[in-house]
Swiss-Prot record:
Family: Belongs to the chemokine-like factor family.
Cellular component aspect of the GO annotation: extracellular space; membrane
Topology in membrane: Multi-pass membrane protein
Organism: Homo sapiens (Human)
Key words of the record: Chemotaxis, Cytokine, Membrane, Transmembrane, Transmembrane helix
Organism superkingdom: Eukaryota
Major place of residence: membrane
GO biological process: chemotaxis; negative regulation of myoblast differentiation
Domain MARVEL: 29-213
Cysteine pairs bridged by disulfides in the record: none
Tissue specificity remark: Highly expressed in the brain.
Protein name: CKLF-like MARVEL transmembrane domain-containing protein 5
Alphabetized InterPro entries for the sequence: Marvel (IPR008253), MARVEL-CKLF_proteins (IPR050578)
GO MF terms, alphabetically ordered: cytokine activity
Amino acid sequence: MLSARDRRDRHPEEGVVAELQGFAVDKAFLTSHKGILLETELALTLIIFICFTASISAYMAAALLEFFITLAFLFLYATQYYQRFDRINWPCLLQGHGQSGGPHPLDLLSHSAKVQPQPWPGLTPPGWHTPAAVPWVPAPAPGFWSWLLWFICFHSLGSSDFLRCVSAIIIFLVVSFAAVTSRDGAAIAAFVFGIILVSIFAYDAFKIYRTEMAPGASQGDQQ
């Protein structure tokens, strides 16, 4: 173990190398079945974003959001970085943060000072608050973002990945059929790629459910 003085006095390159080792990419995963699925989803999402940029710019935000979400999951899987914060005890963290008088962590998601966060009974755990509406992302329902964060924190990465695939299927189905009505060449191309992407997301969700979620449910029934 290095002391505080040793860490401060060591050569800067040593710290950079240590940080890079923490984000080592598993090349075997990138060529695996799951890695190829994520890379295909990432490429098709980027193509759809380009098509929407050239035709209907109002729909490109959905494709861009899914692109960054898929990129984040590819990073977590390829680096296995999710193992460092799997099942974090967020309620204790939030309770301690609130007692210290600091801002609520979920309130940091808000970009609007006019909308006050409100609790969402039923889905939001006790002590949690709904973040205020984010201007550049439409809120589907009150408390959606806090519920999504709660789901990701308290479930495995496979369950969160399953939720990502299901939400992407719904989003791209709606956006693709809405874009094809414009009869623009780029919009029609986005519709075709969107249908292909939806089928890939559906296959990915099926594989996740069959390999990670179904065995856990069967073990729970046996107990």
